[in-house]
Regions:
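Feature captures the catalytic ectodomains and active-site-proximal regions of enzymes
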Residues: 1-205
Length: 205
Protein backbone atom coordinates (compact mmCIF):
# COMPACT_ATOMS: atom_id res chain seq x y z
CA UNK A 1 0.00 0.00 0.00
CA UNK A 2 2.84 2.43 0.75
CA UNK A 3 4.57 1.85 -2.63
CA UNK A 4 4.96 5.16 -4.54
CA UNK A 5 7.48 4.26 -7.27
CA UNK A 6 4.88 4.41 -10.03
CA UNK A 7 1.14 4.23 -10.48
CA UNK A 8 -0.15 0.69 -10.36
CA UNK A 9 -3.19 -0.62 -12.14
CA UNK A 10 -5.62 -2.88 -10.36
CA UNK A 11 -6.10 -6.11 -12.27
CA UNK A 12 -9.23 -7.96 -11.14
CA UNK A 13 -9.18 -11.72 -10.73
CA UNK A 14 -5.41 -11.94 -11.09
CA UNK A 15 -4.25 -15.42 -10.10
CA UNK A 16 -0.72 -15.30 -8.67
CA UNK A 17 1.19 -18.58 -8.63
CA UNK A 18 4.74 -19.14 -7.37
CA UNK A 19 6.96 -22.16 -7.86
CA UNK A 20 7.80 -22.37 -4.15
CA UNK A 21 6.62 -20.81 -0.90
CA UNK A 22 8.43 -17.60 -0.03
CA UNK A 23 6.38 -16.28 2.89
CA UNK A 24 3.53 -17.98 4.67
CA UNK A 25 1.37 -14.85 4.61
CA UNK A 26 1.65 -14.18 0.85
CA UNK A 27 -1.82 -14.56 -0.74
CA UNK A 28 -0.59 -16.72 -3.62
CA UNK A 29 -0.91 -20.29 -4.78
CA UNK A 30 2.21 -22.46 -4.59
CA UNK A 31 2.97 -25.06 -7.25
CA UNK A 32 5.40 -27.04 -5.09
CA UNK A 33 4.61 -26.61 -1.38
CA UNK A 34 7.44 -27.22 1.05
CA UNK A 35 7.62 -30.86 2.07
CA UNK A 36 8.56 -31.63 5.65
CA UNK A 37 11.46 -34.07 5.72
CA UNK A 38 10.99 -36.72 8.37
CA UNK A 39 13.54 -39.25 9.56
CA UNK A 40 16.63 -37.83 7.82
CA UNK A 41 19.61 -40.16 8.06
CA UNK A 42 21.32 -38.04 10.72
CA UNK A 43 18.26 -38.33 12.96
CA UNK A 44 17.93 -42.09 12.42
CA UNK A 45 21.60 -42.58 13.29
CA UNK A 46 21.15 -40.46 16.40
CA UNK A 47 18.10 -42.44 17.52
CA UNK A 48 20.16 -45.62 17.18
CA UNK A 49 22.85 -44.19 19.46
CA UNK A 50 25.41 -43.81 16.68
CA UNK A 51 28.25 -41.30 16.75
CA UNK A 52 28.49 -39.20 13.60
CA UNK A 53 30.91 -36.59 12.27
CA UNK A 54 29.99 -34.13 9.51
CA UNK A 55 32.77 -32.21 7.75
CA UNK A 56 33.07 -29.71 4.90
CA UNK A 57 34.71 -26.43 4.08
CA UNK A 58 32.61 -23.39 4.83
CA UNK A 59 31.53 -22.89 1.21
CA UNK A 60 29.47 -26.08 1.59
CA UNK A 61 28.58 -25.62 5.25
CA UNK A 62 24.83 -26.00 4.71
CA UNK A 63 25.19 -29.23 2.76
CA UNK A 64 26.54 -31.25 5.71
CA UNK A 65 24.37 -29.51 8.30
CA UNK A 66 21.01 -27.92 7.43
CA UNK A 67 20.33 -29.80 4.17
CA UNK A 68 21.59 -33.22 5.28
CA UNK A 69 19.70 -32.92 8.55
CA UNK A 70 16.38 -32.39 6.78
CA UNK A 71 16.12 -28.62 7.15
CA UNK A 72 17.33 -28.57 10.75
CA UNK A 73 20.23 -26.32 11.74
CA UNK A 74 20.82 -27.84 15.18
CA UNK A 75 22.89 -30.97 15.69
CA UNK A 76 21.28 -34.24 16.69
CA UNK A 77 22.57 -36.00 19.83
CA UNK A 78 25.81 -37.81 19.00
CA UNK A 79 26.62 -35.52 16.07
CA UNK A 80 29.79 -33.46 15.82
CA UNK A 81 30.94 -31.13 13.05
CA UNK A 82 34.08 -29.70 11.51
CA UNK A 83 34.05 -26.70 9.18
CA UNK A 84 37.28 -25.86 7.35
CA UNK A 85 37.51 -22.20 6.25
CA UNK A 86 37.26 -21.78 2.48
CA UNK A 87 39.96 -19.66 0.81
CA UNK A 88 39.31 -15.95 0.44
CA UNK A 89 39.58 -15.52 -3.32
CA UNK A 90 37.42 -13.67 -5.84
CA UNK A 91 36.65 -16.84 -7.81
CA UNK A 92 37.69 -20.39 -7.08
CA UNK A 93 39.49 -20.94 -10.39
CA UNK A 94 42.22 -18.85 -8.73
CA UNK A 95 42.63 -21.59 -6.10
CA UNK A 96 40.99 -24.75 -7.46
CA UNK A 97 42.38 -26.85 -4.61
CA UNK A 98 40.19 -24.77 -2.28
CA UNK A 99 40.47 -26.24 1.25
CA UNK A 100 40.27 -29.90 0.24
CA UNK A 101 43.66 -30.85 1.67
CA UNK A 102 43.27 -29.33 5.16
CA UNK A 103 39.73 -30.72 5.26
CA UNK A 104 41.11 -34.16 4.44
CA UNK A 105 43.76 -33.88 7.15
CA UNK A 106 41.07 -33.01 9.68
CA UNK A 107 38.97 -36.03 8.72
CA UNK A 108 42.01 -38.34 8.73
CA UNK A 109 42.84 -37.13 12.23
CA UNK A 110 39.26 -37.82 13.26
CA UNK A 111 39.51 -41.35 11.85
CA UNK A 112 42.71 -41.95 13.83
CA UNK A 113 41.47 -40.56 17.12
CA UNK A 114 37.80 -41.54 17.22
CA UNK A 115 35.54 -44.47 16.44
CA UNK A 116 32.59 -42.80 14.76
CA UNK A 117 29.85 -44.93 13.27
CA UNK A 118 29.27 -42.53 10.38
CA UNK A 119 31.33 -39.78 8.77
CA UNK A 120 29.97 -37.36 6.17
CA UNK A 121 32.42 -35.37 4.02
CA UNK A 122 31.60 -32.88 1.27
CA UNK A 123 34.24 -31.73 -1.22
CA UNK A 124 33.26 -28.40 -2.74
CA UNK A 125 35.80 -28.23 -5.57
CA UNK A 126 34.10 -30.00 -8.49
CA UNK A 127 30.98 -27.87 -8.08
CA UNK A 128 32.40 -24.48 -7.13
CA UNK A 129 35.28 -24.54 -9.62
CA UNK A 130 32.95 -25.97 -12.24
CA UNK A 131 30.81 -22.84 -11.93
CA UNK A 132 33.75 -20.72 -13.10
CA UNK A 133 33.87 -22.42 -16.49
CA UNK A 134 37.68 -22.43 -16.48
CA UNK A 135 38.64 -25.85 -17.85
CA UNK A 136 42.23 -25.99 -16.54
CA UNK A 137 41.03 -25.06 -13.05
CA UNK A 138 38.27 -27.68 -13.23
CA UNK A 139 40.80 -30.35 -14.09
CA UNK A 140 42.98 -29.29 -11.16
CA UNK A 141 39.97 -29.33 -8.84
CA UNK A 142 39.08 -32.90 -9.83
CA UNK A 143 42.69 -34.05 -9.49
CA UNK A 144 42.80 -32.58 -5.99
CA UNK A 145 39.58 -34.26 -4.88
CA UNK A 146 40.68 -37.54 -6.45
CA UNK A 147 43.86 -37.42 -4.39
CA UNK A 148 42.09 -36.42 -1.17
CA UNK A 149 39.16 -38.81 -1.48
CA UNK A 150 41.60 -41.60 -2.29
CA UNK A 151 43.41 -41.00 0.98
CA UNK A 152 40.14 -41.06 2.92
CA UNK A 153 38.94 -44.26 1.26
CA UNK A 154 42.26 -45.95 2.02
CA UNK A 155 42.06 -44.89 5.68
CA UNK A 156 38.46 -46.07 5.97
CA UNK A 157 39.37 -49.41 4.40
CA UNK A 158 42.33 -49.82 6.76
CA UNK A 159 39.97 -49.31 9.67
CA UNK A 160 37.56 -51.94 8.37
CA UNK A 161 34.90 -49.45 7.33
CA UNK A 162 32.84 -48.98 4.20
CA UNK A 163 33.09 -45.88 2.02
CA UNK A 164 30.30 -44.58 -0.19
CA UNK A 165 31.40 -42.08 -2.83
CA UNK A 166 28.71 -40.18 -4.74
CA UNK A 167 27.43 -36.71 -5.65
CA UNK A 168 24.13 -34.84 -5.50
CA UNK A 169 24.47 -33.47 -9.05
CA UNK A 170 26.97 -32.98 -11.85
CA UNK A 171 28.89 -29.89 -12.95
CA UNK A 172 32.57 -30.10 -13.83
CA UNK A 173 32.22 -33.17 -16.04
CA UNK A 174 30.96 -30.70 -18.64
CA UNK A 175 33.08 -27.56 -18.70
CA UNK A 176 32.42 -26.65 -22.35
CA UNK A 177 29.02 -26.25 -24.01
CA UNK A 178 28.98 -28.77 -26.84
CA UNK A 179 26.77 -26.62 -29.06
CA UNK A 180 28.36 -23.20 -28.61
CA UNK A 181 31.91 -24.03 -27.56
CA UNK A 182 31.51 -21.53 -24.72
CA UNK A 183 32.29 -22.28 -21.06
CA UNK A 184 29.62 -24.35 -19.31
CA UNK A 185 29.09 -22.94 -15.82
CA UNK A 186 26.01 -24.57 -14.36
CA UNK A 187 24.81 -27.88 -12.97
CA UNK A 188 24.16 -30.85 -15.22
CA UNK A 189 21.33 -33.36 -15.01
CA UNK A 190 23.36 -36.42 -15.92
CA UNK A 191 23.24 -39.50 -13.67
CA UNK A 192 25.86 -39.50 -10.93
CA UNK A 193 27.94 -42.49 -9.94
CA UNK A 194 27.67 -44.22 -6.57
CA UNK A 195 30.55 -46.40 -5.40
CA UNK A 196 30.32 -48.67 -2.36
CA UNK A 197 33.86 -49.58 -1.32
CA UNK A 198 34.49 -52.27 1.27
CA UNK A 199 35.62 -55.85 1.80
CA UNK A 200 32.16 -57.41 1.65
CA UNK A 201 29.43 -57.67 -0.96
CA UNK A 202 26.57 -55.28 -0.36
CA UNK A 203 23.12 -55.75 -1.86
CA UNK A 204 21.67 -52.26 -2.10
CA UNK A 205 17.90 -51.84 -1.85
Amino acid sequence: PEFVGFERLYIPELDLITMTSYEADYPVKVVFPEVEITNPLAEVLSQEGCRQFHAAETEKYAHVTYFFNGGREDMFPGEERHLEPSPKVATYDLQPEMSARPLTEAVLARLRDHDDDFILVNYANPDMVGHTGVLAAGIRAVETVDECAGRLVAAIDAKGGVAIVTADHGNCERMIDEKTGEPHTYHTTQPVALFVIGDQYYDLR
